[in-house]
Amino acid sequence: DTARYPEAVSALTDLQSTLTKHVTALEAYNERTDGGGVKEALKEAVAGALGVAAGFYDQLRPTDKVSRMIRDAYTATSLAAISYHMLYTTALALKADDLAALALGNLSDLTDRIGQLSETVCTVVAAELTDEDKTIDPTVGADAVRATQAAWATMEETS
């Protein structure tokens, strides 16, 4: 029941809004791009990114637990993010600076959303487990957020 998890609803709504914006921008780019030659390779890359973003909507199932919805959204968003890596690299290689900027901007949007989802899933899982077993301490969600975010921060420090 999503009504019990306003932070999850907020994260998923933010993601949906972001992906809608991405689809609109990618479609606009696709419409103003002529077919053929070098442009055809870009069209394929754009179409791939569009497909990932559009496919996200099909993965949200209202009958699932909220934690599963977040997990599925995280997975789809990670796929979209790696697609933007590929689109950005393709655009750079083909000297399509406007598309490179679009891909990098969209990737930046998604990194924020992935972070939001990764924090939210911990508190939602803890709450769902508490619903199933009242002996579970729901504050472990906040502990999990701190530890998992620290793990990501450690990865960033070493790269």
State where each predicted segment sits.
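Short N-terminal signal/transit or membrane-insertion segments
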Residues: 1-21, 118, 131-135
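Inter-helical turn/loop segments and adjacent helix faces that build the functional surface
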Residues: 1-8, 33, 88-104, 123-131
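Alpha-helical transition-metal enzyme core signature, strongest for iron centers
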Residues: 12-27, 46-53, 73-84, 103-118
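A structural signal for alpha-helical segments
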Residues: 3, 7-10, 14, 37, ...
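Hydrophobic secondary-structure block in the mid-to-C-terminal portion of proteins
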Residues: 100-159
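Carboxylate-rich helix-loop segments that flank metal/cofactor sites and access channels
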Residues: 24, 28-71, 133-144
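Acidic/histidine-rich alpha-helical segments that form the ligand environment
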Residues: 1, 45-95, 99
